[in-house]
Amino acid sequence: MPRFCYSRSGALLLALLLQTSIDVWSWCLESSQCQDLTTESNLLACIRACKLDLSLETPVFPGNGDEQPLTENPRKYVMGHFRWDRFGPRNSSSAGSAAQRRAEEEAVWGDGSPEPSPREGKRSYSMEHFRWGKPVGKKRRPVKVYPNVAENESAEAFPLEFKRELEGERPLGLEQVLESDAEKDDGPYRVEHFRWSNPPKDKRYGGFMTSEKSQTPLVTLFKNAIIKNAHKKGQ
């Protein structure tokens, strides 16, 4: 009974193993190791021989459990599910992609327009996806308004007769103010209305050196004092 069970299970295993290849089936039938399948050792030896021959004749590809050749191209299967590593006519080689890129550039610039320099191309491509990466154009400068231009325009707008009338109607106080301003423009500007400006001569040093005696040199004062003291001692 156990021998019958062993032989039956061995026959089933052998049938499943030999289903994959008809050539191996015929070779196993003709092999001397598979002639007697009554014992367990002969059965295992036949299975090993058939399995070894199957692995040598039929290549085993990774990823298929039935040990059959892949139906699709292995090169396409390797990284085809990634967007940046697809194999194709455009990205098959670096030389092909460079040639195609060069042909596209020639088609774009074929109308006679000057081709941009590589530095400009790099500058436009390097940071164009950032808002602050684009090269800044000319800065807008504020418009300067010159008072002389406004005066000239007003002078052109008024005739000569009206200008004479306006000059004759000027008050006296305004003329004096204008004259004083003109004098100030000629000389140096003094900050007289501030406290830290130069004080008048009569108020310098607290009024100590305002008299004529104060203008005498200090050596003369000491000399006079010494002479007076000597004269008093001599009396």
From Swiss-Prot:
Modified residues (Phenylalanine amide): F87
UniProt GO cellular component terms: cytoplasm; extracellular region; extracellular space; secretory granule
InterPro entries: Mcrtin_ACTH_cent, Melanocortin_N, Opioid_neuropept, PMOC, POMC-derived_peptides
Subcellular location, record wording: Secreted
GO biological process: calcium-mediated signaling; cell-cell signaling; cellular pigmentation; generation of precursor metabolites and energy; glucose homeostasis; negative regulation of tumor necrosis factor production; neuropeptide signaling pathway; positive regulation of adenylate cyclase-activating G protein-coupled receptor signaling pathway
Positions of modified residues (Phosphoserine): S154
Residue positions, PTM N-acetylserine: S124
Post-translational modification: Specific enzymatic cleavages at paired basic residues yield the different active peptides.
Valine amide: modified positions: V136
Glycoprotein among keywords: yes
A Pfam family per the record: NPP
Glycosylation positions in this chain: N91, N152
Amino acid composition bias (Low complexity), ranges on this chain: 90-100
Biased amino acid composition, Basic and acidic residues: 117-126, 185-205
Family membership: Belongs to the POMC family.
Record's protein name: Pro-opiomelanocortin
Species of provenance: Mus musculus (Mouse)
The organism's taxonomic lineage, starting at the top: Eukaryota, Metazoa, Chordata, Craniata, Vertebrata
Gene that specifies this protein: Pomc
